């Protein structure tokens, strides 16, 4: 990855769902430099979720979407994570397992210092049982899980 390439580059992006005649995104331009933080704010239906899924390569389109100079659909770069809302409904994360065991099962032991900092910051208790916590607590566990590894690009939609 060249340090001079933007982290994200999208020009004149148009997207519409097959089931709709209206555009979800129309003429969208976005350039994010490495290390930048961007918060997408908009009304329901404005295209925030669609844009994040496109950037993550989770939804296909014919646009030229570059992440670290690579096309997300044809040669997706490594080092990208997408934390989406679907995760909270997954039966695996609603099982009878402690947060400690769950985080270890996804590699938390490899990043223990970073994991512990996130647990403290997000006020997550390792003894919580995943099937007994609220949706808000489950999303905090998801953030901890998703941010434990040092990703090059984190796309967070929760």
What are these regions (language model features)?
Residues 56:
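Helix-to-loop junction immediately C-terminal to a conserved catalytic motif
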């Amino acid at each position: 990855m060249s340090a001079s390439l933007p982290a994200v580059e999208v020009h004149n992006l148009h997207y519409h769902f097959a089931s709709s005649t209206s555009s979800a995104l129309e003429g969208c331009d976005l350039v994010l430099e490495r290390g930048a933080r961007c918060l997408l704010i908009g009304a329901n239906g404005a295209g925030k979720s669609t844009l994040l899924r496109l950037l993550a390569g989770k939804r296909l389109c014919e646009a030229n979407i570059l992440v670290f100079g690579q096309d997300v659909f044809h040669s997706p770069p490594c080092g990208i994570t997408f934390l989406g809302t679907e995760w909270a409904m997954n039966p695996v994360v609603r099982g009878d397992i402690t947060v400690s065991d769950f985080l270890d099962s996804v590699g938390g032991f490899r990043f223990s210092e970073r994991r512990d900092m996130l647990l403290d910051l997000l006020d997550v208790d390792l003894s919580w049982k995943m099937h007994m916590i609220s949706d808000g607590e489950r999303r905090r566990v998801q953030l901890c899980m998703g941010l434990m590894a040092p990703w090059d690009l984190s796309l967070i939609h929760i």
